[in-house]
A protein has these predicted regions:
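Residue-level recognition of beta-strand termini and adjacent short loop/turns
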Residues: 8, 99, 332-334
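Short, intrinsically disordered, charge-balanced linker/junction segments flanking boundaries
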Residues: 325-336
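Well-ordered mid-protein domain cores that form the structural environment of catalytic cofactors
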Residues: 1-53
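N-terminal polybasic phosphate/anion-binding patch
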Residues: 258
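Long alpha-helical segments found as membrane-embedded helices
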Residues: 262-264
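Signature for the C-terminal beta-barrel architecture of outer-membrane proteins
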Residues: 10-12, 40-249, 254, 266-326
Length: 336
């Protein structure tokens, strides 16, 4: 939940702890609703054709190996979390109505260590300033923080009466154009893309959503897992992490108090070799943002979906299809 204060008709301050979802897609490559609730404070500015959000949040990263069950016996509970390392993140997005049903948005984010360069409980005040660019600020403060950038574009045709929506979203973790042109599969070309179509029937009873997403290996990761784009040992963005391709189709039928939903999700993802809980693999294919990119086995030859190129034992590509459905009935409110 959260607390909000309306400073003016166009400015709102908010703080609390809850999940966030940035974007119009079912999934988000920036911040996804499936992530753990995030302690945060935010500023929102809404004008006629522009909306700006600036968010500061505290992330937590858990280590396996618990404190003793009883302080005097020295035993640990396997599989529980003993160490909790904190980090900070800042994110902002500006969305603009471009006219004729078009909307565009720009996104920026940065994560930084709570303890860095000998400073404990470090809060970088520069990142809390609204309307700044995080990447130049990162260079200015002289710290190797983890920055992300992104953009989105959507179109809701006016003739469709808000029943049709085309939506796209990209995220850039790191990108060198010359390395893309070379075609050598450089590991640090880290990006993701998402596209979706939403359709609602004229009688508003049917709704269809088709969406596809792809994220290259090692996207969202960092040399230190505490600076990765994660919170409480899970991704802040798409729950699959990276090194995957996904397609989904959702259908909903609603009439009076009845609602029926059906969906299917297909995914192909490069997977690391299995390891015990809390044990980081010696080499990684870049699917889990919690694994440091330092443990990559190669710098080149990294495909969009990568199985390790035969350099990692028991690593491979996993493909699966999931179906789901539910039926709901809304009870009328009680009177009296």
């Amino acid at each position: 939940g959260h607390l909000a204060y309306q400073v003016s008709p166009s400015v709102q301050l908010k703080c609390g702890q809850e999940p966030h979802h940035w974007g119009q897609g079912w999934r988000s490559l920036w911040m996804d609703r499936q992530a753990s609730p995030l302690p945060f404070a935010s500023l929102q500015v809404r004008l006629k054709r522009l909306e700006y959000t600036h968010l500061i949040a505290r992330t937590q990263h858990l280590g396996v190996g618990s404190p003793p069950a009883i302080p005097t016996n020295g035993r640990n509970h396997p599989g529980s979390y003993a160490t909790r390392r904190g980090a900070w993140m800042a994110a902002h997005a500006v969305e603009v109505e471009l006219g004729r049903g078009w909307k565009g948005a720009l996104f920026g984010a940065v994560t930084w260590l709570n303890n860095d360069s000998g400073y404990t409980h470090r809060f970088e005040a520069a990142y809390a300033l609204p309307f700044i660019s995080f990447r130049p600020t990162e260079y200015a403060v002289g710290s190797a923080d983890n920055a992300l950038m992104g953009a989105s574009l959507s179109w809701a045709p006016r003739w469709a009466d808000e029943r049709l929506l085309f939506y796209s979203q990209i995220v850039l973790d790191e990108l060198v154009v010359s390395e893309i042109r070379s075609g050598d599969g450089w590991w640090a070309n880290k990006w993701g893309a998402l596209g979706a179509i939403q359709w609602i029937s004229p009688n508003r009873m049917w709704r269809l959503v088709a969406e596809g997403a792809a994220v290259r290996p090692f996207t969202y990761s960092h040399a230190s897992n505490v600076q990765s784009w994660t919170h409480r040992n899970g991704p802040l963005a798409h729950p699959a992490g990276s090194n995957f391709i996904e397609g989904r189709l959702h259908m909903q039928w609603k009439r009076n108090d009845w609602k029926v939903r059906l969906g299917c999700v297909w995914m192909q993802q490069g997977m690391d070799e299995p390891t015990p809980l809390g044990v980081t693999p010696n080499l990684t294919v870049g699917a889990d943002p919690l694994n440091s990119y330092i443990t990559r086995p190669a710098d080149y030859g990294i495909d969009l979906i990568w199985d390790g190129g035969g350099l990692i034992d028991q690593a491979g590509i996993q493909e699966n299809m999931r179906w789901w459905g539910d039926i709901a009935f809304s009870l009328p409110p009680l009177e009296g």
